[in-house]
């Protein structure tokens, strides 16, 4: 079974299940409540506390355990009850700037483990990951709107994630990996700036969900003064990000500039208010990378079948 997963620094995303925070608590004894997965004699519970940013997600087992959660959720979502072990083909991705150096290691991180047994929701799972295909983030998201990009001689994809903002230049619909990078300008940096400013000026500890509510125009329960600080910091953050891209000789006032990722959805109002981008285009689906991985895998498989 093909399962696509986006291992974000802020959230893990799949096609059929709601995103969940990239955070785990490990225990030697079964904890009370929560989403608890049992693996190799240990108990893992999802938490809203993110794993600290890791450029290399293969340094320990935590992202593998998060992958087990994602696989179980996908199997449950499609009511897949095939013979054990379930053979799984993973489609995953990495930031374009890390892709060349890390793709082999990231694929090997999931492979050669044999049959993996774990329990979630009192159900025993046995899976065998027999294939891993890795693709560049941002390009994968762009694939979901490929028909609108293939006729464009130049398009810039900007993927604003949790810890990084990745960019990739497309020429006639093809990714140019010589013009890509990952900037440490993700929304986690914005959250930290806002929390510090609000704590200093309002003596208030603001939660990230409250920040999200303010930026998305929802009821946050916060004062106008706090909301003003949040919006002002967000506008400055967007201005700094776009200036950083311009300093890298990336043209934002001609050609298509495609914004994707949860951060782009969160900051859409600030991006549209900026005078540094002529006509921003937004991919609203925060699971666009996941869907792109699936499309790329399927296209690759058809190509192999046809002898390409």
Predicted regions span which residues?
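A contiguous pocket-lining binding segment that forms or flanks enzyme active sites
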Residues: 197
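PRPP/pyrophosphate-binding module of the type I phosphoribosyltransferase fold
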Residues: 167-172
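Ser/Thr-glycine-rich phosphate-binding loops at phosphate-binding pockets of nucleotides
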Residues: 160-166
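Short, basic interhelical loop/turn and adjoining N-cap
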Residues: 202-206
């Amino acid at each position: 079974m093909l399962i696509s997963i986006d291992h974000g620094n802020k959230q893990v995303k799949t096609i059929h299940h709601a995103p969940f925070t990239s955070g785990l608590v490990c225990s030697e004894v079964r904890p009370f409540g929560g989403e608890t997965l049992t693996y190799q004699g240990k108990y893992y519970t999802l938490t809203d506390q993110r794993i600290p940013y890791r450029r290399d997600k293969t340094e320990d087992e935590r992202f593998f355990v998060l992958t087990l959660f994602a696989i179980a959720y996908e199997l449950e979502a499609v009511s897949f009850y095939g013979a054990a072990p379930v053979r799984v083909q993973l489609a995953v991705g990495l930031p374009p700037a890390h892709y060349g150096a890390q793709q082999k290691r990231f694929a090997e991180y999931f492979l050669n483990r044999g049959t993996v047994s774990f329990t979630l929701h009192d159900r025993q799972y046995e899976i065998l990951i027999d294939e891993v295909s890795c693709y560049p983030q941002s390009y994968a998201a762009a694939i979901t709107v490929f028909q609108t990009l293939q006729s464009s001689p130049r398009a810039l994809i900007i993927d604003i994630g949790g810890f990084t903002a990745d960019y990739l230049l497309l020429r006639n619909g093809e990714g140019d990996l010589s013009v890509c990078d990952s900037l440490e300008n993700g929304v986690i940096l914005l959250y930290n700036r806002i929390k510090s400013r609000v704590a200093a000026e309002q003596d208030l500890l603001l939660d990230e969900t409250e920040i999200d509510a303010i930026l998305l125009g929802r009821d946050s329960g916060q004062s106008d003064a706090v909301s003003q600080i949040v919006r002002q910091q967000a506008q400055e953050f967007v201005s700094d990000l776009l200036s950083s891209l311009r300093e890298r000789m990336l043209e934002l006032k001609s050609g298509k500039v495609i914004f994707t990722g949860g951060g782009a959805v969160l900051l859409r109002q600030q991006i549209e208010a900026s005078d540094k981008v002529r006509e921003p285009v937004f991919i609203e689906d925060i699971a666009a990378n996941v869907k792109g991985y699936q499309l790329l895998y399927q296209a690759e498989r058809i190509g192999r079948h046809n002898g390409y």
